[in-house]
């Protein structure tokens, strides 16, 4: 149903609302139409976990702009823009422009500067998680049901595929996603009166 599709294109939408505690809430997402394969599905998750660590290190630890921040990445078997990366978080209103610029930079530079030190712990974690999922009946049931939607098996051979993923794979995947120019930002600010009162 097109009504439930992600809005394509690049842009920023801004809104305001009265708040007792002035904070800026932001959503950053980028989307793409990518071939649904077992490897691409894993690359979406791997890439998002690397981006999450970057966001945590930069936006929380270095900038001190928010208490918590992370990113998610996933592929859907259905829909046109089937690949989604997103992060949503509150932050200090006075830092919003700086933070949003940092997120854009951290994201776009993944096209060229992902390191083995970033990739290795993510792959190790996912291999461990897959091993646990293989022992769980509900994981098997979900995987079998999902494969009927498009015939792509994405469960049994996960660990084998994870072992083949390289830094270059991650960089190319992010590059291909960003090349489709669907990078959207939504900002909810405190309205003027509340923001002034907080100064």
Short names for language-model regions:
Residues 1-54:
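His/Glu-based metal-binding/catalytic segments typifying zinc-dependent metallopeptidases
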Residues 57:
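Long, His/Glu/Asp-enriched segments that create or flank divalent metal/ion-associated functional microenvironments
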Residues 171-189:
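Bilobed periplasmic-binding protein-like "clamshell/Venus-flytrap" ligand-binding domains
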